[in-house]
């Protein structure tokens, strides 16, 4: 008995070859609609248009093509259920064994910043998801192919099973299809949520996130943990759009560290050279310099021991002078918005170092997500831009312009250090970083110990308020002259009084930057 296949695709990759083999090798007849039918006819292949098969023309400018009982009955009919087979015979519905459908490019459409709502709406597929879901639901009898990458595997299944398809394959394709339609509907829902929200940061009552596996990773944080890298959206963006110039395959930990490095370096104006060196998502050296090479040397020397095996982020294209410095130590990854040819040549001497070019270092996700038992925690990303103009001077002593610049630098770095976070800086270079301690004065002591005598005359930034005046007194004893912190403690007055007593400058930002 001749079998029917329904082909209706937006992405026509591989569709002609698939159709040819279905007809000539496996005795299929083809039903198709719209542009797919035209493409098959242009290739000289016999095809019945959906409108001819159903007896109903395409209407509403093509909005209604396949929504018909002869189509959906043929897909949904259960071949092992007498009542279904009787209904199909009564209504002259032929079983459809194969459904090949992919969807209108909605996500690509809305990726265009100039797209109108009307254009977006016309790229919401209705018939396609309906066909896919029907075929996936009836996978016991129907094969559904929702992506060209499955065509060859399907043909191989037919060849190896005397023209049949294994239940295991049909079930797998059903799962892939429901994942696709879920992702597609999620993208549409998120688009409408954005349209209806007065404030883009407002979180919806329903939150949908989905991704397509971009790359399998060797393992996760540890070798016993499985891991994979998923791309959100249909077009590569962010790290998926980066170019890796050399080095080994990126690991899970590399990607986590690279994103942390990107977030830090995005704080600094690309007109002014800046470099950040990280280990385990915490900065160990950050600096602004006269040149990129100068900034790197300052950041490296801030903690040369921790920089070994580190992740380097630069806010300007990598040049030969900086590349030469990078080859002097072992590094895991380097990312920059560009890399000149001389720098590329120099870096080949360290061929295992992963070197990436990510032109758009400044833009990242607008939300952060954490998975907890039974749910997700979603928050707006900590992208607030706070500058000394909005801060409050709370001490008798006033900061100089140079000190204001130093305070801002230290504050930007502290924002990206695990809480409790303390950062000691001078000349817009980190000298000591206290990260992740359970009490704030503990982080103060670590940062000051690391800075040593260089802390004299320096700046100290704290991501959270001081609960007591002990941190201020400890900082002053090490020679710190200016402090920036959020404020908000019930004992702020004690810290301010200590700062006045010890002749320090203190500014309160009014904004906290916890990072967990």
UniProtKB/Swiss-Prot annotation:
Keyword list, A-Z: Hydrolase, Multifunctional enzyme, Purine biosynthesis, Transferase
The MGS-like domain, residue ranges: 1-146
The protein's Enzyme Commission number: 2.1.2.3, 3.5.4.10
Pathway: Purine metabolism; IMP biosynthesis via de novo pathway; 5-formamido-1-(5-phospho-D-ribosyl)imidazole-4-carboxamide from 5-amino-1-(5-phospho-D-ribosyl)imidazole-4-carboxamide (10-formyl THF route): step 1/1; Purine metabolism; IMP biosynthesis via de novo pathway; IMP from 5-formamido-1-(5-phospho-D-ribosyl)imidazole-4-carboxamide: step 1/1
GO CC terms in record: cytosol
GO molecular function ontology, one term from the record: IMP cyclohydrolase activity
GO BP terms in the entry: 'de novo' IMP biosynthetic process
Top-level taxon: Bacteria
Keyword Transferase applies: yes
Family: Belongs to the PurH family.
Notes on the domains: The IMP cyclohydrolase activity resides in the N-terminal region.
UniProt cross-references to PANTHER family, sorted A to Z: BIFUNCTIONAL PURINE BIOSYNTHESIS PROTEIN ATIC, BIFUNCTIONAL PURINE BIOSYNTHESIS PROTEIN PURH
Protein name: Bifunctional purine biosynthesis protein PurH
Gene designation: purH
